[in-house]
UniProtKB/Swiss-Prot annotation:
This is Serine--tRNA ligase. It catalyses: tRNA(Ser) + L-serine + ATP = L-seryl-tRNA(Ser) + AMP + diphosphate + H(+); tRNA(Sec) + L-serine + ATP = L-seryl-tRNA(Sec) + AMP + diphosphate + H(+). CDD domains: SerRS_core. The gene is serS. It is found in: Cytoplasm. The keyword Hydrolase does not apply.
C-alpha cells in the first residue's frame, strides 16, 4: 500500500509514477478524502488539547481550595464533557474516512523503482543474461508426451476427480516431484534460509497484506462458509508470519524458504497451456522470502535472484534472466527479475521464477516494522520462486529426454531420486 501522506501531499508524483505502469489516474477523490481526514484529525487534536487544559484547570482549582461542586468548577466540567462528546463524533467520522481511504489505497499498485526499465508490456522487457546452452532439435518431444510414455501423471482421471487443469502425479512422476521439493529446500537451507511449511488456508487479512486482495479475488479459491482462502503462493502466509510486529534491526535479514501447494483459478487464461504441467489450478512451489532493513533491500534483490538461479544451475537447466519493464510489473512489485527456463521440446523459454523487491508496500499493508537507533520504520520485503516445481519437472523431462525413451536426470538430483534416469515401467 502506498503512503497516504504521499498520495495526499504529492498526487501529481503518484499519478506520474503509476503512469509509468501505463495507468491513467485521477486522484482528486482520494486526495479529498485524505485531506478531510487530516482536517478532522487536526480538529480532534485541538479539541483534545482544550479538554486537557480544562481538566488541568479543574484540578488546580480544587487543589487551591475551590468546592468541587461550585458553579465555576461544574461549568468547566460541563465544557469538558461537551468536548469529549465532540471528540467521539470526530473519531467516528475519522474511522469512516479511514476505511474509505484504505479501500482506495488498497486498489493502487506499488510504484515502480527508478531503476526499472520503461515499457508498456512484456515486449519491452529486457534480457539481462543467459546461462547454459539451450538444447535444440526437430524430434524433441514436449513434456506431456514424455510423461505419457513414462506414465508420470494422470490427466483424464484427474478431470473426473476435480476438473480440468488438475493432474495426479503417479509412480516416478510423484517420486520426482518429491525429490525436487526436497532438493530445493536442502539447497536453500544450506545457504542459511529457515525452512517454513505454512498453512495453505489463509484469511482475508493475509491475502490483503501481501497484495493479492482486493485486486486478485477472482483468481483465488475461497471457502464458502469461512473467512479462508486457498493460498495462491507461500508468499501470502509468510508475509503474515510477522504481521503487526516490530522486528529488531539486529535480527535482520530474516530469510525463509517455504514449500507449499499453491492454488489459482487462472481466470482469463482459457485456452492457454491446456496440456501438461505449465498452468494448473494446483501446483507445488518453493518460495524464497526476505524481510530486510530498508537500507539493504537492493543488495538483497540481487542475492535472492542468485539463489533462485542456483537451483537451475545445479539442475543443469539453461535459462535467461529478464528484467520486467514498468508496464509488466506485478501489483506489489517495484522491480522484478523473471527467470525463464528453456524447454527444448517447446523450443521456447518459459517463466519459472519471479524475483521481486516490494519495498515497504507489503509491510505497510501488514504493519511490519523494524526498529534501530534511528527509530521505528517500515521494513522491506522481497520474494522469489525457488522454484515452481511442476515447471521444473517439465524442463527436466524435455532437457533430459533420450532416444531410447528414458530421461536422464542431472547429477545433483540422483541422491534424491535414487537413480540417474526415468525409464518406462
Amino acid at each position: 500500500m502506498l503512503d497516504q501522506r504521499l498520495v495526499r501531499d504529492n498526487p501529481d508524483l503518484i499519478a506520474n509514477e503509476l503512469g509509468r505502469r501505463g495507468m491513467t489516474l485521477d486522484l482528486t477523490g482520494l486526495q479529498l478524502i485524505a485531506q478531510q481526514q487530516r482536517n478532522l484529525e487536526e480538529q480532534r487534536s485541538s479539541l483534545q488539547a482544550e479538554g486537557n487544559r480544562i481538566g488541568k484547570e479543574v484540578g488546580q482549582r480544587i487543589q487551591q481550595g475551590s468546592d468541587p461542586k461550585a458553579s465555576d468548577v461544574a461549568e468547566l466540567r460541563h465544557q469538558g464533557n461537551l468536548i469529549k462528546q465532540k471528540v467521539a463524533v470526530l473519531e467516528d467520522e475519522e474511522k469512516q474516512l479511514s476505511a474509505r481511504l484504505r479501500e482506495q489505497l488498497l486498489s493502487l499498485p506499488n510504484l515502480p523503482s527508478p531503476d526499472c526499465p520503461e515499457g508498456r508490456d512484456e515486449n519491452d522487457n529486457q534480457e539481462r543474461h543467459c546461462w547454459g546452452k539451450p538444447r535444440e532439435g526437430k524430434d524433441l518431444l514436449e513434456h506431456w508426451s514424455i510423461a505419457e510414455r513414462l506414465n508420470l501423471f494422470e490427466t483424464e482421471r484427474s478431470v473426473r476427480i476435480a476438473q480440468s487443469r488438475f493432474v495426479t502425479l503417479m509412480g516416478q512422476g510423484a517420486r520426482l516431484e518429491r525429490a525436487l521439493i526436497n532438493f530445493m529446500l536442502d539447497l536453500h537451507t544450506s545457504k542459511g534460509y529457515r525452512e517454513v511449511m505454512p498453512p495453505v488456508l489463509v484469511n482475508t487479512a493475509s491475502l490483503t497484506g501481501s497484495g493479492q486482495l482486493p485486486k486478485f479475488a477472482e483468481e483465488s479459491f475461497r471457502c464458502a462458509e469461512d473467512d479462508l482462502w486457498l493460498t495462491p503462493t507461500a508468499e501470502v502466509p509468510v508475509t503474515s508470519l510477522h504481521r503487526d510486529e516490530i522486528i529488531p534491526a539486529d535480527q535482520l535479514p530474516l530469510r525463509y524458504a517455504a514449500y507449499s501447494p499453491c492454488f489459482r483459478r487462472e481466470a482469463g487464461s482459457y485456452g492457454r497451456d491446456t496440456r501438461g504441467l505449465i498452468r494448473l489450478h494446483q501446483f507445488n512451489k518453493v518460495e524464497l522470502y526476505w524481510f530486510v532493513h530498508p537500507d539493504h533491500s537492493q543488495a538483497a534483490h540481487a542475492q535472492i535472484t542468485a539463489d533462485a538461479e542456483a537451483v537451475l544451475q545445479a539442475l543443469e537447466l539453461p535459462y535467461r534472466v529478464i528484467e520486467l519493464c514498468t508496464g509488466d510489473l506485478g501489483f506489489s512489485s517495484s522491480r522484478t527479475y523473471d527467470l525463464e527456463v528453456w524447454l527444448p521440446g517447446a523450443g521456447a523459454f518459459r517463466e519459472i521464477s519471479s524475483c521481486s523487491i516490494c519495498g515497504d508496500f507489503q509491510a505497510r499493508r501488514s504493519a511490519i516494522r523494524t526498529k534501530d537507533q534511528k527509530g521505528t520504520r517500515l521494513i522491506h520485503t522481497l520474494n522469489g520462486s525457488g522454484l515452481a516445481v511442476g515447471r521444473t519437472m517439465a524442463a527436466l523431462l524435455e532437457t533430459g529426454q533420450q532416444s531410447d525413451g528414458s530421461v536422464l536426470l542431472p547429477k545433483a538430483l540422483v541422491p534424491y531420486f535414487g537413480k540417474d534416469r526415468l525409464e518406462p515401467e
